[in-house]
Amino acid sequence: MKRINKIYHHSLYKEIMDKISQLEKGRIYCLHGVEHAMDVARIAYIINLEENLNIDKEIIYATSLLHDLGRGINYENHAQQSVLLAKKILPDCDFNESETEQIINAISIHGEEKNTGLSGIIQRADKLSRLCYNCKSISTCKWKKEELNLEIIY
């Protein structure tokens, strides 16, 4: 997990995560900070193990840490900004070209339904990470009732 720690300590990662924190200050709905990124990583890794997908742990964690980073640049349409930021950060953290391509491909489509492989588990983990069952703002949430996580799954 040395490369994951390099991402976490990368100056650009820190700078953008601070921006996201400022943008979300006072937000009553789900946040997109490090806690969310780590929740997504852990859930995605559990899914990976349960479904015997054999996706490398560091690839899952790197994708999870970077998937929402673009919110610090363009909050609403963040996926492509996340890709651009990941392209700057990953080489500095010893990810090779093939790994970087795999990660940025997953980030670019992580919000789409019915993905498979890495992007699929990131998308599922992203949704499953939401603690709707414990949210004080659930009554005004924009999510449809059938999308809410009303039970603990992971």
Regions found by a protein language model. Give the residues of each.
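Metal-dependent phosphohydrolase cores
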Residues: 1-154
